[in-house]
Amino acid sequence: MCFLEGKLRKLEKSTGEPGEEGFQFQVSDDGDYNQRHYEALGDVITEYVYDLLETEVGLVRLPVPVNPDHPSTFIFASPNALTADAPLVILVHGSGVVRAGQWARSLIINDSLQSGTQIPYIKKAREMGYEVLITNSNENSKVINGKRIAIKGSSNAVAHVSYVWKNYIQGAKSNQVLIVAHSYGGHCIVELAREMFPSFKSKVVAVAMTDSVHRLSSKHAMEKYAKFLSLASRNWVSSDLPLDEPESTREGEIPRVSAGTVKHELTSWSCLQSVFAFFEAALRRTRRHDDL
């Protein structure tokens, strides 16, 4: 298997070159073998996307925890993400097997790198002069000497996002933080806002969620962090309505609009242009306020 023009293709046996045939899950009558084959391919894709983050879009690795113990993990950022005063885009994926740089492994395998990875978001942000930092919230433990050990600062997704905020984003020069959070990533951001509200409010300009699974209940509605999120955020949800059409939203919740697709995993890709238009509008409002 290899990627050709961003799409996974099977190699032709006769030529060794990529053909027209895409990934096939069923390569054997043994269901367990097929699953192991799929998971092994997923592991290769993770490393391939990591390489693209460094070679194609020029990101660098930052350790988690900051002073690496064993075990440890890493996030990715543009070289000047922590020192530039330009807007800083934070990307937070959902739960499951995805790692930094991915929105949906199934899309990478069955559709394309464009729809399944965060690379289009990174390229768009860099084109607009923004810095970028992407989290890696699903790498929570490592096996060392046969024993699974939790990673300090990354024992679960919520802890990972909190650690990255406290140790990297909070001290970054930029006070124009823009967040994109997909699915469970939205829950992580809600928890971050609740835990770190003073610094969150001082740095965050806008939050774009894509089919977020968070929940702001009525008991939260009067809390400051919930009010801030409801004003500064928008949630693009899977829907059969046209892109950006308003969806029903409970009182006190983050406003919901259509992502222009009924597929959960496609929401981030489908609403990319709308997300950046939302960010630009939020930045303009901030700049006008600063000029007063």
Regions found by a protein language model. Give the residues of each.
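Short, surface-exposed "cap/lid" segments of acyl-processing enzymes
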Residues: 61-142
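Alpha/beta-hydrolase active-site loop
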Residues: 116-119, 123, 127, 137-175
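Gly/Ala-rich beta-loop-alpha elbow adjacent to hydrolase catalytic centers
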Residues: 179-189, 207
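N-terminal targeting or regulatory segments adjacent to alpha/beta-hydrolase or S9 domains
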Residues: 1-72, 84
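The feature captures the conserved acid-bearing segment of alpha/beta-hydrolase catalytic domains
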Residues: 196-292
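Structural motif
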Residues: 86-89, 176-178, 206
